[in-house]
Amino acid sequence: MSGTHLVVGSGASAAMVALTLASRPDQHVTVLDLGGRLETERRAALQQLAGRDEASWDPVALGAVTAAPAPRGTRGVPQKRTYGSDYPFRDLGQTTGLRSRQPGTNLDVVSSAYGGFTNVWGAQAMPFSRSTFDGWPIAWQEMERHYRATLDEVSLAAEDDDLAGTFPLLNRRSRLPPLGPRAEAVLQRYDAHRERVRGLGLTVGRARLALRADACTRCGLCMTGCPHELIYSAAQTMDRVRRLPNVTYRDRLLVERIGQVGDQAVARCRDLATGERAEFRADRLFVGAGSVGTTRLVLGSSAAPPSRVEMAESRQFVVPFLSARAVEDPRRPGARDFTLNQFNVLVSFDEEDRDTSHVHCYPYNPAYLGALPAPLRHPAASRAATSVLRRLTVGFGYLPSWASPRITVTARRGRSGGLPELDLSAPDTHRPPMLGATLRRLVRAAPALDLWPLPTHVLLSGAGKSYHFGGTFPHRREGAAADGTSTDRWGRLPEWDRVHLVDGSVLPTIASTTFTLTVMANAHRIATEVLAGAGTGPVRPVVELTTECSR
């Protein structure tokens, strides 16, 4: 049966929904997007580098696309850049009106970029464990096929190792690029002391990356933006979607209201170029504006919104490791390495690998120099700094949402019919108990792995900094009472039968493993089931939007 659909956004979930819907020629898809892009001059510089031998790279062009972010004067992980640009975070209206009274709270939580935050992600692509879905209304057996379908779209570089027992590989893959000497040393020691380390509840394995690894040149620029564009971005999927004849893409639009009129779903937008407002209608609306962006739309559009909602987060922490045995200086002439996460340490507190902390371990990249203590950055301390860099590994760790502080989102009416203002706060400021338990396990395993955590230098990132957040409108179990802050398995709130939330906002829980692959798989599941005729209950229009311009 033919149908028309609106898709809000172009990030991971929106791209997967648009691809799924548009794969049916009888379905017409209109994508409404802010569509922020890399600046023209940086795009030109990138094109000068792409496909050329690195020895012939223009230093000026290289400098333009590898510029580091300016220090903000605060302790913590700096805002990431891609090709020297902050365009994924640039405010085109999507973060205006977001605030927090708590220092350190991340407010760069909605992307304006074409492709969303996949332009700056770490490319880790792992499913949630089977046991995570015991707390969901959707079982692992249902999700597995959608993980596989997602990995048909996302290139995976991975190895079959001990992590596969909990996180199956699920699909074809390429091998990772050669690992750096520190990663190889840790993995060799893990193999030699495997029984001892596993007895402590730790599993060590290679990274799982959304990367076309077979073309990787190991130029070392992963963290500033791959010059060959080998790291997956949802923009790549959207590029493919936009070439289909049954897809219309509209950018420079800020969606401000969503709802239903009669048997049609409605999205009301503001044109960024003209300031004029327009209304789009279709049979169904799929909202993939990111967890906070979608939450904001719902709170501003619902007939009787709650004054506040709770958002789950897989809280991030940063842990530096030192090793007794040094490797070669990572800055030595001719050194080649890829700088994405190279190996993972899973710390498990149960037999089912549900209560876990997941640590992604990164090799050297130039940002480490600026993060060294001030005395080590002095020229007179260059030998000491070199000694540290030959031993240093940085881990980005995550806790599951049920062991992490929650974020309270409070809404206030916006101005002139625009988006509501939001206040983000994390009332619980205590260090999560699981973090301490994780560090103790890592210390106990350190002699076997020669990977010694520095507990005194562990940083618990501010609320929202992990970017693994959502669950404001979680899927509820079948038969559970419907309320204004839960959705059915197709992402529908009780008042809208034709509006589907499809991003992280509907995840019931967030495991400690990275969640982008799960967000994409769940979005694919929703779109696939809707196309198959599910989620077609009686229409109950609630929100009537004034038509200023119909499309």
Give the residues covered by each predicted segment.
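Core beta-strand elements of the Rossmann-like FAD/NAD(P) dinucleotide-binding domain
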Residues: 2-3, 275-284, 288
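N-terminal glycine-rich phosphate/pyrophosphate-binding loop and immediately adjacent elements
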Residues: 3-141, 305-338, 521, 525, ...
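Mid-to-C-terminal "cap/lid" subdomains and adjacent gly/pro-rich loops that border
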Residues: 36, 45-87, 248, 256, ...
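Conserved redox-cofactor binding core of oxidoreductases
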Residues: 57, 61-90, 100-103, 107, ...
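A glycine-rich dinucleotide-binding beta-alpha-beta segment and adjacent secondary-structure elements
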Residues: 90-95, 210, 215-222, 256-259, ...
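Conserved beta-strand-loop-beta-strand element in the redox core of flavoprotein oxidoreductases
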Residues: 257-279
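C-terminal catalytic lobe of FAD-dependent flavoproteins
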Residues: 373-448, 452
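A conserved FAD-binding loop/helix module that cradles the flavin
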Residues: 509-527
